[in-house]
Amino acid sequence: MSPTPDPSPVPSPGLPQQDEEQRLRELGYRPVLARRMGGFGNFAISFSVISILSGCMTLYGFGLNTGGPAVMLWGWAGVGLFVLCVGLALAEVTSAYPTSGALYYMADRLGGRRWGWYTGWLNLLGLLGAIAGIDYGAALFAGAFANLQWGVKPTPGTTMLVFCVILLLHAVLNLFGVRLVSLLNSVSVWWHLGGVALIVGALVIVPDHHRSASFVFTEFVNETGWDNQVYVAAIGLLLAQYTFSGYDASAHLSEETSHASVAASRGIVRAIWVSWLAGFVLLAGLTFAIQDYDATRTTDTGVPPAQIMLDGLGTDGASALLLIVIVAQLFCGNAEVAAASRMVFAFSRDGALPGSHLWRKVSGRTQTPVAAVWLSVSVACVLALPSLYSATAYNAVTAINVIGITPAYAIPVLLRLRAGDRFRPGPWHLGRWSRPVGWTAVGWVACVTVLFCLPQASPVTVGTMNYASVALAVVLVLATVWWFVARRSYGTPSAPYGSGRDQADFAEGIV
């Protein structure tokens, strides 16, 4: 099918809905996962992974120091627009290749094996780092809640214990099958939206004092140690960019989604724009309610939004709203485990991981990649272990997440642009807007990848260093070393599924 001049990113009206199982066979894979997720569930998983109640709350303190209210609010508006371009461009390629492998499969088909290999490793380690970052963040917030409610001061050991319990919970929930995952993600959507409404509503109604609109939209604050305000504003954009990540989850769950060639693409785009609007409301509501800026920025709770709630609503009100945030983080981590495990399954299916024959196994009862789920949470646990000894280690885990996932989004889009008319779009496409939106997306990702690697505080020390560049180097070195070891075993299918070898391979992959 060739692109149409219709600029609207909607399915072409003259096309019949594809048989998704047959389409998957055409892409070279036997359907082994249960296709029980609807369009809303597919949107819900990306919305849950983006999780404005997780990202905005966790990095709000970073925003207070790095540009302040003006950069947080206007940065969110601007970054959201560019991220929407990335999502639109990625959704178009997803419609053409609706597989669990998602980004790396797209890159492999459009650019060759090496492109697919490096994209896959960036995406995989980014997803595993995201599980560690999200669930460890939830453990930190749980510690703040315990301190606020019962005066219990969390230690690195207790935080790690809570983190491991959360990981175990998410693993078990994902073993029950995609129907439960889809249900939890659907609940998560309304929990997030209702939570934002409740938090903002309470902060608007209850406190006697509010900041002026001039303060919220124009106040610039620099506590980074850097003198250049443009530089500070640029790195301040990372609050929004970090939050707007993980929307590739819709693509990773496409083999379990009905009408995936349309629903997965819609899921990506809807998750971004709904998060964009709701996140702006949340940030504005928090900022208007700040009672004492410096006290909030340096709060003993370690969680500035908790201090805003405490000052404006009292201990009981703050505890209740903090609990809403913690539950939202749990929804977020559960969705991330689902996405990461599908990536592990798909990458193993194509022979890219050590012990691939183990990790690609699918339960015949629940039709879920059981071994991939356990591997995902186990690696996430290992990534977070250094946090027992250093708070800086948590920053490094976050760096692995963002520096892995962010460039991986742009690679399939760049290769699609390079392919030109050789690219055959699916039923969901951008028409004549494909190239301008695509180049905007690639340019933005290139810019923010550089921003992610810049030092965020001065002077640069072991404790303040930005480890994103180190994480990127480590990922690329590991991927290169393993390429020379495993390149003979790795490969996406070059023909439709149905050969005797393929059937034998997958017969032993069902447990």
Which residue stretches match the model-derived regions?
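Terminal cytosolic tails of multi-pass membrane transporters
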Residues: M1-M37, V413-V437, P455-V511
